[in-house]
């Protein structure tokens, strides 16, 4: 039986583009693991995607994952079918422009084939303590690398 994991993720950028950080919480039963990272030159969207990728890559075996993010870019790409359309259209948007962050989207595609992932949208910077903690982790990663 696959483990059921709850993941919260967030990305942040000081300037967009600029220095960026990401944070994630992985929860299994009573255990919680915090992870975070930094990039010296990036965008907010890349950090949002990186948080999800790093969290999913942390899992040692295929799992059932409920991933919560305040990123409409991430959640809508999956839940609204954008990612499927982009791949079907050779990584072009409906406006025939190249999709941004293809390298990260390709990693996400690989990871969501390995894990059974359901994406959930949460309101950012509100009363969700898990999302707020991820935001703190992302901002701290930036601060620690100034």
From Swiss-Prot:
It comes from Chlorobium phaeobacteroides (strain DSM 266 / SMG 266 / 2430). Belongs to the RNase H family. One of its GO terms (biological process) is DNA replication, removal of RNA primer. The keyword Magnesium applies. This is Ribonuclease H. Its EC number is 3.1.26.4. The gene is rnhA. Residues 1-143 form the RNase H type-1 domain. Mg(2+) 2 binds at residues 10, 135. It is found in: Cytoplasm. Mg(2+) 1 binds at residues 10, 48, 70. Its cofactor is Mg(2+). Binds 1 Mg(2+) ion per subunit. May bind a second metal ion at a regulatory site, or after substrate binding. Monomer.
